[in-house]
Amino acid sequence: MIMFPLFGKISLGILIFVLIEGDFPSLTAQTYLSIEEIQEPKSAVSFLLPEESTDLSLATKKKQPLDRRETERQWLIRRRRSILFPNGVKICPDESVAEAVANHVKYFKVRVCQEAVWEAFRTFWDRLPGREEYHYWMNLCEDGVTSIFEMGTNFSESVEHRSLIMKKLTYAKETVSSSELSSPVPVGDTSTLGDTTLSVPHPEVDAYEGASESSLERPEESISNEIENVIEEATKPAGEQIAEFSIHLLGKQYREELQDSSSFHHQHLEEEFISEVENAFTGLPGYKEIRVLEFRSPKENDSGVDVYYAVTFNGEAISNTTWDLISLHSNKVENHGLVELDDKPTVVYTISNFRDYIAETLQQNFLLGNSSLNPDPDSLQLINVRGVLRHQTEDLVWNTQSSSLQATPSSILDNTFQAAWPSADESITSSIPPLDFSSGPPSATGRELWSESPLGDLVSTHKLAFPSKMGLSSSPEVLEVSSLTLHSVTPAVLQTGLPVASEERTSGSHLVEDGLANVEESEDFLSIDSLPSSSFTQPVPKETIPSMEDSDVSLTSSPYLTSSIPFGLDSLTSKVKDQLKVSPFLPDASMEKELIFDGGLGSGSGQKVDLITWPWSETSSEKSAEPLSKPWLEDDDSLLPAEIEDKKLVLVDKMDSTDQISKHSKYEHDDRSTHFPEEEPLSGPAVPIFADTAAESASLTLPKHISEVPGVDDYSVTKAPLILTSVAISASTDKSDQADAILREDMEQITESSNYEWFDSEVSMVKPDMQTLWTILPESERVWTRTSSLEKLSRDILASTPQSADRLWLSVTQSTKLPPTTISTLLEDEVIMGVQDISLELDRIGTDYYQPEQVQEQNGKVGSYVEMSTSVHSTEMVSVAWPTEGGDDLSYTQTSGALVVFFSLRVTNMMFSEDLFNKNSLEYKALEQRFLELLVPYLQSNLTGFQNLEILNFRNGSIVVNSRMKFANSVPPNVNNAVYMILEDFCTTAYNTMNLAIDKYSLDVESGDEANPCKFQACNEFSECLVNPWSGEAKCRCFPGYLSVEERPCQSLCDLQPDFCLNDGKCDIMPGHGAICRCRVGENWWYRGKHCEEFVSEPVIIGITIASVVGLLVIFSAIIYFFIRTLQAHHDRSERESPFSGSSRQPDSLSSIENAVKYNPVYESHRAGCEKYEGPYPQHPFYSSASGDVIGGLSREEIRQMYESSELSREEIQERMRVLELYANDPEFAAFVREQQVEEV
């Protein structure tokens, strides 16, 4: 009974330890996985896919008899979460148990329904759900109307599902019938491809068993140049998706000419719109082209133009990766550090923020000044998404009885790269980078090189395949390099698998397989020929390559040619014989492995030559108005770059088989002259090779090495994504003393260089029997960047073996704008690296991201990615970062993650002081410098791409350090786990070495795209956090009435300024208004003012009030008095102006009387005679005399004479006389006349 509790505790401790160890693997184990662990998941891909997908993996399974059940068990194990609900529903402290359970049940229903809906569409309809469809099925599932099994039944019985099955069956039957025509090959010679399932077809593409076995199997016969059977595969339709958008352009005026597609305005606006908007789509996987459908006048207002355009995506390129990322994001509740897929823009196909992604990109281009158009992001609408079928003829499969040529159909390689994508259920991610359809900005190009030789088999096949895939805007405008397969004889002893993937920058983003290059190796030369493809209908004239004699070779072509160049079968030997030749040389018996970069020598002869390269420009798929026959080889040397630097790569290996290394890139040239130098081999008739294409010319000479050494190491060289360099390669043999001389010259020349003060390589010896794993890291995993200090170069190590005369000289011609070449070595018992490699955590796929705002030292592009795997010790590794041209014309930015990572930690054995709030204080600066000195070297040595560290602030709570890390390259969203483990290890190291106690449980790490910057600003309750939407910077802003002094937390003005309110006033904070003062109030006095600075008394107020009233009364009285006086003066002046004597008065008086009579109703009958007298009548009355003969001072006779002298008639005169008599005799009538006079006045 006593031992039982103890045993239970021990068991619980062991269980917790197992859980923790399961979720937090060590960094070293995660970074350097063994080859078997890396390649096991790839073998398991076949049984996780449909049954038809596993047919082509039979060859792999024959060579790798793995335990299927064991592998399946390891594959299907899902990792436990390290903590409770790390990415799911959180438990809030204020929640009750019932609420927490209800929330978790609700979250569980949502997650299950999401999975069910996604899987139903994926399984039965093989497409993505629309927004309405998704919400419809989600509502049915969440409401319990339809169960997940009923949902599957409904989907399986749908018409769309049945038509999809019929279409798949039809394609499968055509494939089987076509595969029966291929010639049989012995099964025993089937080569396995490094435990990688290469034959997994795309979900929308049928399996090609016949093509795969024809390309993977090789009979044991002698090498020959004869080509016999040519089999054309069946035509299969490839899916395309067309998304139609509409957007409103501001600042453009609609005109009728825009309706005519042939008008100048329509074409000009169309070209301008496509060039601007295309940047938002080029980073998306599967993007092919964009075209404008029409321009419309806006409905709401007359300003601007509505543009309707369609974007075409390749369904083959996005379907598989899209589904994987759908499952990945829908399963994010179980996301952990081992599943590390970059968050590519493929996600926007499956998440509702697709519109926001495009709109944000367009808006950023306009705000940054990169766009002349002003699109309205709110007006962007996704109108329709439809799928179309395009017919594409499969590549020709060349079958030769002599097994000298075995071409791999590019569809197989395409399926290989698609299969290399881990699905959403993967818990182990391979370190070998698959073809990432969304990692390169505009497009991706895959290459595969493998070599397999079973024990006892003396035939080793080196296959170099280039399934080039490019996008088109018009049919003849894409250059394609075809699959290349080389065979050679070697005493193969060691079985090695060398899967490699590569990508190159091109104009289009969709993936089109076209053309197959067929190569034959004879005794003295190799022949290359490109086969015609039916996907391009317009032929392009071939350019003639002059002979390779004692003069420089100039190659002319057209910079406007970007289509593939078809060759006829009749030119198989005539045109290619001058292009590619391999000379046999007999090497010495000693073995040596060297890697030497010569910074100033041009060819294998060790002599300086004038190699001229042209700067590559971004490929454009637009048609050119200039003729195709215009040569790009001109004599204008002013267009040449200012500085040219040749890089010579000397590879001396202990390989006994023929090393075939080939490189081809697709670019569009500027109009610049290009000359290739004369290649003079040291011994033997080695002749350079010029690949006849319109996009790149490269000189290549491949010697055939024959050695008696029994040991074999098979290596493959693969180009990495985003290659921007022209390469001239020559191969020859030389003796070891010349190699030493070249090495010395390299060191002298590089040491004397003033522009680049760094070494190309250092040489150290390793055991000759050691087999190494060569890996060229991408730029984000470089050991360091260019520096002017030679002291930092002590970490650069180059591995080499004892000397041998088997050498392959590679002369790489590049521009001088290059990042440094860095080489590091990992031995069994010693690790010598400048940076601890956590590439699996930070940048697994190996993509690099170009930031235009960075300085020149940060603009370098990774030039190549070489990963060669063997079946030997996985810890023996040589890492090489090849330099490439950091072109200034690059403008692609891929946003797979953030450039910033926030983290905070708590130091428990240090006391906080108020001075740590002030960033200008000595204590703050001292503590900041201490943490920078501790953290920066540690982070720089453990984090790839680490740029700088910024201490944001110190906060109380012992001491809480909030920091922000910046990276030179974007990091994956799930980088938090890696940073967390590194900081956790730092906490332990700091406590053991510096007595700095850091609480591990206080670590908080968030990436910049997911983090809340305000969280790390620690704004208090008196402030708010504001985030700059463009820079992402956060700052605290105090509320009104609060103030931050010396960057301390916001405090009240009442506390900071005790004398804010005077005269004993009370300070108070009014929310939204700020600080106010509440002043004192007495019985008959009080204080007032903003700061209570004014004294007010009641008697004074009363006196002022009385005085004010009296003053107003006086003012009103004065105004009234002056108004009355003014009226009187006006009246008197009017009276003085009116005369009283003379004859002039009488007519007026008479007229007034007449007017009065006129308006008197008593005298209506007499109005007509009074109309002509309208003058004012004086205010003086007529005075009647005693006699009736005198009226108004005039006698009747005088009045009669006055009227008679006028023009009045007799009747009128008599009437007026009667009126006058009435006026004189009737007082009332006289008063009436006077009233009329006053009114007239």
From Swiss-Prot:
Key words of the record: Cell projection, Disease variant, Disulfide bond, EGF-like domain, Extracellular matrix, Glycoprotein, Heparin-binding, Membrane, Receptor, Repeat, Retinitis pigmentosa, Secreted, Signal, Transmembrane, Transmembrane helix
Region (Hyaluronan-binding motif involved in chondroitin sulfate A- and C-binding motif): 1210-1218
Stated name of the protein: Interphotoreceptor matrix proteoglycan 2
Species assigned in the record: Homo sapiens
First and last residue of the signal peptide: 1-22
Residues glycosylated per entry: N154, T190, T192, N301, N320, N370, T544, T556, N942, N956
Bias (Basic and acidic residues) ranges: 660-678
Gene that this sequence comes from: IMPG2
Entry GO CC: cell projection; extracellular matrix; extracellular region; interphotoreceptor matrix; membrane; receptor complex
Molecular function as annotated in GO: extracellular matrix structural constituent; heparin binding; hyaluronic acid binding
